[in-house]
UniProtKB/Swiss-Prot annotation:
Main location: cytoplasm
GO CC terms in record: cytoplasm
Keyword Signal among UniProt keywords: no
Gene Ontology terms for molecular function: ATP binding; ligase activity, forming carbon-nitrogen bonds; tRNA binding
Designated name of the protein: tRNA(Met) cytidine acetate ligase
Source species of the chain: Staphylococcus aureus (strain bovine RF122 / ET3-1)
């Protein structure tokens, strides 16, 4: 069976995602579409608006198979996110990865990926790091502010291409042009497509605009948000106050004395956004800081970070997805394709299980990795 993989977060699923899946399948003539999706915490450095089980059910309206991306991938840099996602795709024997981009010029993106790999080894790069500049700014400066680097999906696409070249040369890549909505649009401005940001804003504010930009047959799944950043902040504040400076120093992505900055600013912080602003420096982007804070919340240490794929968790599948999974289990009997977590296989998913428990403790949701069987229908 020919397969196409999509690296996703679906926070939440919307018409743009449905378009992406359908176009990917059309352009590759794939028999099966595999969504590799972030779990309960996403790359923005925040909890997903709906838990991973609800979002997997949404995705099953169009995709055939939904696989959970390791939790630490979403709480890392774009490059590490891409590396782990590509490794999952390789584990799933994906033929082609299809990603969305603003310019839809795969040749240019591949050239930029090659150039960035070379730049990262240069003295100029090392010098700019010492100057305290952020990674995105350094790359932009050394590539003379190439226009493709101004778009977030282009940048992530470049990370996928770098990871494919390094870890999975057997996987092809194609780009699907994003339609209409811009990544960071805060309001719904189009009758069919909208950004995830604007849809979350619409859902949280309880207006009806989001109804126009998500598939009609799954709108029953878009209930009151499971969790918001405002709910998380008291738990995060408690964690930072309770932890010693030395303990904070041992959290993944906390370095260069940032633990002292956390300690010195937390008592005056009144909410999550105020706290993030008080932590901002020229070296770190807001998104990096938010991911760092989620690592603190989840108590993720460098030794907890997933580097290689030993098993994958299947969140959802339809009949076609089940057929493909059966094929994989026959072709690769040594690999672990887990549909239900139990005591014998839980050690593969320690971070994901912990992230779900903490998400539930704050949100009041009841679905866990142990009591939720693989999702097989979305209606």
């Amino acid at each position: 069976m020919k397969s196409v993989g999509l690296i996703t977060e679906y926070n939440p699923f919307h018409n743009g995602h449905q378009y992406h899946i359908n176009q990917s399948k059309k352009l590759t003539n794939a028999d099966v579409t595999i969504a590799i999706m972030s779990g309960n915490f996403v790359m923005r450095g925040e909890p997903a608006i709906y838990n991973k089980f609800t979002r997997a059910k949404m995705a099953l309206s169009t995709a055939d198979l939904v696989i959970e991306l390791p939790a630490t991938a979403s709480l890392s840099s774009g490059d590490h996110f891409a590396e782990l996602a590509v490794k999952v795709a390789d584990y799933m024997s994906v033929d082609t990865i299809a990603f969305g981009s603003e310019n839809n010029d795969i040749k240019t993106l591949k050239q930029l990926a090659h150039s960035i790999n070379e730049i990262e080894q240069s003295e100029s790069f090392s010098q700019k790091v010492k100057e305290g500049k952020s990674y995105p700014r350094i790359i932009s400066e050394l590539l003379e502010h190439h226009e493709a680097l101004a778009s977030p999906n282009n940048i992530l696409g470049i990370s996928y291409l770098k990871a494919i070249a390094k870890h999975a040369k057997n996987i092809n890549a194609i780009s699907i042009k994003r339609e209409n909505a811009q990544h960071h649009d805060s309001l719904i401005q189009h009758h069919q497509f909208a950004s995830g940001t604007s849809i979350r804003t619409s859902i949280i504010s309880q207006d009806d605009h989001w109804h126009h930009v998500v598939p009609k047959d799954i709108q029953h799944l878009y209930v009151t948000p499971h969790i918001t950043l405002n709910q998380i902040f008291p738990y995060l504040k408690y964690q930072i106050i309770a932890m010693t400076t030395e303990s904070l120093k041992n959290i993944y992505t906390v370095n260069e004395g940032f633990e002292n900055r956390l300690k010195s600013t937390i008592n005056e912080a009144t909410d999550f956004h105020h706290f993030v602003k008080s932590l901002k420096t020229k070296r770190y982007t807001y998104t990096h800081i938010q991911r760092l804070l989620m690592n603190v919340l989840l108590n993720i240490k460098p030794t907890d970070v997933t580097r290689n794929i030993r098993a994958v968790k299947v969140l959802a599948m339809n009949d076609r997805g089940r057929q493909y999974l059966k094929h994989l289990k026959t072709a690769f009997p040594e690999r672990q394709y887990i549909t239900n977590i139990n005591k014998s296989n839980a050690h593969y998913f320690t971070n994901e299980i912990k992230a779900t428990h903490i998400y539930n403790a704050i949100s009041g949701q009841q679905q866990t990795d142990f009591n939720t069987p693989v999702i097989q229908q979305y209606r």
